[in-house]
């Protein structure tokens, strides 16, 4: 399943919903799942939940395994969430991803003994749309109920959040496609306001660590500024790091990331289960899409075949020049978390 497994690590695939609890109409048999990176010892560790990005269209493997290993090696027990996405606009997601991450936090706290974690040290780390998902939980946690009675009295509020090149606003600086995936092409004003996170920060929002690059051409850096300003006005502890240069989607910004050694064996589907099930449904004639669309998806995501190269060598050389500055974010975040999670 996952390359780079280390001796003493417990890797499990854990479905977060029972079949009868999960109702997204375009799931095609998929149930959201988390992958664990747990130290095989008796120590109680802080927990980290990773939410990869992908415009709410996919959960990117490049923002999954590598940050999970970074925090695992820093002493965290880590859970990477493959939440519900909307690849082909079959059905707006609405609040399903928010329900997914809320359930994940509650499940981890409920199983704190089993997972060897401290329930008062549960952080979340999201990238791009995954950061929007994490930010949504930070500002709307009180709104999210859970159908499972055992979880209803367990808090879903994270103790701290890392928002990496986050989608934040539905306003002037919005990443529009993320909001189309959530609400369709004709969202209501109420829906857009609810998911414009800078409008909903309160004193109860958990501490947040934000980072982004000035030259991000996909999600404007103003998204981070808007959320940081809202935190400042509400008295929420926060840190903000804006790096001078770098493309969108840098993940941990290492050479390993650049060469796409991202913990996904060639042709495997780690973090791409929903895409594979969609492709299989298309090829079986269970959707309105032409059958060749299924093969197109499998090629695009490298499932069952070699994935096309993401960059040319010349493009990689340009990206490589920006990595040293940006990759410092992981250590900065870990030091910040030690303060706000009171990690020993």
Spans of model-derived segments:
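N-terminal cap/lid segment of alpha/beta-hydrolase-fold proteins
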Residues: 7-43, 172-177
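Short beta-strand element of the alpha/beta-hydrolase
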Residues: 45-53
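Catalytic nucleophile-loop/oxyanion-hole region of alpha/beta-hydrolase
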Residues: 60-61, 66, 81-119
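Short alpha-helix in the alpha/beta-hydrolase fold that links the catalytic acid
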Residues: 63, 197, 220-231
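C-terminal catalytic histidine-bearing segment of alpha/beta-hydrolase fold enzymes
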Residues: 91, 225-344
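Primarily recognizes the serine-hydrolase "nucleophile elbow" in alpha/beta-hydrolase
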Residues: 103-178, 188, 192
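Acidic catalytic loop of the alpha/beta-hydrolase fold
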Residues: 170, 215-219
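Short beta-strand/loop motif that positions the catalytic acidic residue
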Residues: 204, 210-212, 216
């Amino acid at each position: 399943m996952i390359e780079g497994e280390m001796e003493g690590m417990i890797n499990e695939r854990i479905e977060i919903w029972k079949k009868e609890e999960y109702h997204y109409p375009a799931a095609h048999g998929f149930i959201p799942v988390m992958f664990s990176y747990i130290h095989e010892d008796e120590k109680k560790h802080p927990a980290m939940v990773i939410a990869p990005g992908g415009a709410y269209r996919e959960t990117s493997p490049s923002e999954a395994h590598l940050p999970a290993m970074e925090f695992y090696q820093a002493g965290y027990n880590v859970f990477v969430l493959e939440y519900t996405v909307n690849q082909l606009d079959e059905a707006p997601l609405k609040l399903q991803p928010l329900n997914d991450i809320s359930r994940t936090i509650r499940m981890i706290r409920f199983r704190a003994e089993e997972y060897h974690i401290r329930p008062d040290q549960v952080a979340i780390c999201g990238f791009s749309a995954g950061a929007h998902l994490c930010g949504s939980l930070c500002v709307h946690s009180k709104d999210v109920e859970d159908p499972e009675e055992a979880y209803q009295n367990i808090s879903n509020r994270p103790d701290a959040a890392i928002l990496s090149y986050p989608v934040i606003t539905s306003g002037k600086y919005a990443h529009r496609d993320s909001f189309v995936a959530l609400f369709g092409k004709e969202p209501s004003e109420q829906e857009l306001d609810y998911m414009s996170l800078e409008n909903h920060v309160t004193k109860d929002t958990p501490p947040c660590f934000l980072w982004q690059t000035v030259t991000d051409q996909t999600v404007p850096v103003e998204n981070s500024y808007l959320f940081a300003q809202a935190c400042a006005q509400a008295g929420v502890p926060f840190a903000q790091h804006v790096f001078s240069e770098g493309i969108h989607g840098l993940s941990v910004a290492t050479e390993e990331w650049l060469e796409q050694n991202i913990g996904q064996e060639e042709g495997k589907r780690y973090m791409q289960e929903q895409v594979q099930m969609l492709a299989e449904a298309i090829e079986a004639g269970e959707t309105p899409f032409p059958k060749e669309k299924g093969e197109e998806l499998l090629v695009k995501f490298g499932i069952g075949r070699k994935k096309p190269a993401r960059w040319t060598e010349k493009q990689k050389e340009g990206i490589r020049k920006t990595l040293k500055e940006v990759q410092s974010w992981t250590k900065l975040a870990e030091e910040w978390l030690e303060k706000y999670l009171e990690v020993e």
